[in-house]
């Protein structure tokens, strides 16, 4: 692949004294692994550009699973993520790294990712709606088709007041039992529209995406979730100290 294409760095790590190993999400080639030779050297003009959440144009080539970065240019400054939105962005990056196969094109998902990061950078409230929309988009691109609007058992439209149990590869069927795998018709309509007007529908969306993504993630926990769990108590402690001043 020798042409320029849009890209974001998902993760980077030292590869040698002067080089970086990059996990990159590109518009045309999907997720690729690149060696950025000389990127760690003091004279490199790439060091500042090869950071997560910086829109890039990249050109790379070579054979095998690991390609060589030929050129990279920052299209703009990094999207401004900090605090809870930074941890949310790291979660999205890790999700892509864990779920997408190498060099499989997901051009539409690339723009879903861009919109998610832009939404996180622009929010002054909760990042949850942007995260849930991206997770649902990711599931859709992976071929995880779910009909949220009809009962899998009867084919009837879902009723706001009824409860439905999710069954993998089948969909939602009416249920009299309420547990972690059940959702109201109101929840399912929110999932279908990807609009979450209240805390209850957001929580339901999070439950569903956790269930649906589990087969793709396996038993290995996400590092970003653990970092987020560590961040939240520290954030609360800082807020309490500020309020007590």
Curated annotation (Swiss-Prot):
The keyword DNA damage applies. Keywords: DNA damage, DNA recombination, DNA repair. It comes from the Bacteria. Pfam families: RecO_C, RecO_N. Transmembrane segments: none annotated. GO terms for biological process: DNA recombination; double-strand break repair. The keyword Lipid metabolism does not apply. InterPro entries: ARFGAP/RecO, DNA_rep/recomb_RecO_N, NA-bd_OB-fold, RecO, RecO_C. GO terms for cellular component: bacterial nucleoid. Belongs to the RecO family. Involved in DNA repair and RecF pathway recombination. This is DNA repair protein RecO. It comes from Klebsiella pneumoniae (strain 342). The gene is recO.
